[in-house]
Amino acid sequence: FVFQNPDHQIFCSTTKEEIAFGPTALGLDGATVFKRVDEMLTLFDLHRYEDVSPATLGYGERRAVALSSVLAMRTPILVLDEPTAGLDHRLAARFLGTIEKLNQRGVTIVMISHDMRAVYRYCTHVLELEDGKVVQYGPIDRSEAAQKQSRTIRKPRKSNGPVSATHVLLKVTKHEEGRH
C-alpha cells in the first residue's frame, strides 16, 4: 500500500535505506536489495538524494521515495492512494508507465484516484463510491464523449471470456476530511 501522504510511510534515515527496507524485510540477499534500490533511484531520478534524509526533501521527492520503496518489494498486488498527487507531470507519467508495465507482468493494481485522465489511460474498470456506497462498477468506456464525463462507464457486455480485473480504479467522489 502506498499512502497519499508520504510522511505516513517514510521512517528511515536516508532515501537509500527507505527503499531498501522492504526488500531487506522480505529476506532478499544484499545483491538483490542493492539492485532494486539502484533501479528505483534511477527510475525516479533520486540518485542525488540517496544519502539524504527523505524528511529534508520536497513533497514530490518524498512521494517518489514512498512509491519507490513499495515498488522495490515487487508485491503481487499494489494498492495506490492518489499515486500521482504532488508529482510533477514528468514524474507522474514515468510512474504511471512503470505501473502499467508492472500490470502487464501480472501485478494487480488498485488505484484510488480523482485523476480521470489517469483512469481512462491506465485502468480497465472503475468502482465509483459516493458517501461510502458503490454507485457504479464496470469496464471503462474509452470513447471521447465518455472521457468528458467522469460518471460514464460501459455497460457490462458479453465476451468470449471473463473480463480481466487486473487494473481496477476506485474513484472517490466525495471526500470528507480525514476519511477516504
Task: Report each predicted region and the residues it spans.
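Conserved ABC ATPase "signature" region
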Residues: 31-49
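Conserved ABC ATPase signature
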Residues: 53-57
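Hydrophobic anchor residue at the start of the ABC signature
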Residues: 67
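Catalytic Walker B motif of ABC-type/P-loop ATPase nucleotide-binding domains
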Residues: 78-81
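Helix N-cap at the start of a conserved alpha-helix in ABC-type nucleotide-binding domains
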Residues: 89-91
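H-loop/switch region of ABC-family ATPase nucleotide-binding domains
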Residues: 113-114
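A short, surface-exposed alpha-helical micro-motif characterized by mixed small hydrophobic
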Residues: 119-121
